[in-house]
Curated annotation (Swiss-Prot):
Species annotation: Saccharopolyspora erythraea (strain ATCC 11635 / DSM 40517 / JCM 4748 / NBRC 13426 / NCIMB 8594 / NRRL 2338)
Gene3D superfamilies: 2.40.290.10
Domain of life: Bacteria
Protein name from the UniProt record: Non-homologous end joining protein Ku 1
A molecular-function term among this protein's GO annotations: double-stranded DNA binding
Protein purpose: With LigD forms a non-homologous end joining (NHEJ) DNA repair enzyme, which repairs dsDNA breaks with reduced fidelity. Binds linear dsDNA with 5'- and 3'- overhangs but not closed circular dsDNA nor ssDNA. Recruits and stimulates the ligase activity of LigD.
Biological process annotations from GO: DNA recombination; DNA-templated transcription termination; double-strand break repair via nonhomologous end joining
Amino acid sequence: MPRKIWTGSINFGLVTIPVGLYAATEDHSIQFHQYERGTTDRVRMKRVNERTGDEVGYNDIVKGREVGGVLVAVEPSELDEIAPKLSRTIDINTFVDLNAIDPVYFQKTYWLAPGSKEHFRPYNLLRRAMDETNQVGIATFVMRGREYLTAVRAEDSVLALNTMFFADEIRDPGELVGDASSVAKPSDKEIQMATMIIESMSGDWEPEQYEDTYTARVEKLLEDKAEGRAPEVEEAPAEPSDVIDLTEALRRSVDQARRGRGGQVPRQRDEEQDVSALSKAELDKKAKELGIKGRSKMKRADLEAAVAESQGSASGGRRRRRAS
């Protein structure tokens, strides 16, 4: 069960809905400690005086910033006095069309859950009303001493809260591209070919088909080194080629897309599939089909080995039955 990080209520009009706030995502990045090379001794960081090199106690540290060439020191108590007070309400002050908000404004996503069973009815009322009108509620609230601009929106079965950037935090993209969009205009033929490529590559959004391959490689590196095996070296990706003739590059891409749609290599039988080429979702599904026990606790390398072994046994059994 995710940990509740904030408790309060959503207010819109005269309706109040008690809710709890939960993180919608989790970070699977591998965290390393620092050690002195050749030892098992952890390395610790100390706060030291830049001029004297002496260690400084936590209570002797103040925050500060230069203003007009003068260092202004600020005490923690002074910051506490002007900090926004903890809010227990998410007061929706306006509803806007979801499509009117540029995704660049969205920062982080949280789930909002009803405070208790008796609050499900008003909770679902707000969720369904926003879903049917494609509206999101704009509100501000305070969490962990900081004021957030937020958008409360409807998902399939839950309310989501997105923290948002304020307008002055969004950088102007015009500083990067200038008037390139009006000067370097593509021809109608180029647009047509680019559209054909996009259409040939179009598909459904299936997020489970994508995985963090770098984290998986780091896990395998650690496992290999722990077991005394030589780490596998990843091949360097091919160097990107410079686009000399845009029209020719588009034409080749269109031809390649057509060949890809019409002349795909037949897929191997399931029992002969190279498990290393499977995505994590496909690997989990295959393990479930093969009835591999304890799969939920296995690391990818162990799961690959178990699936490969199970596939080999199943394939061998089928061949023996055919031969008989």
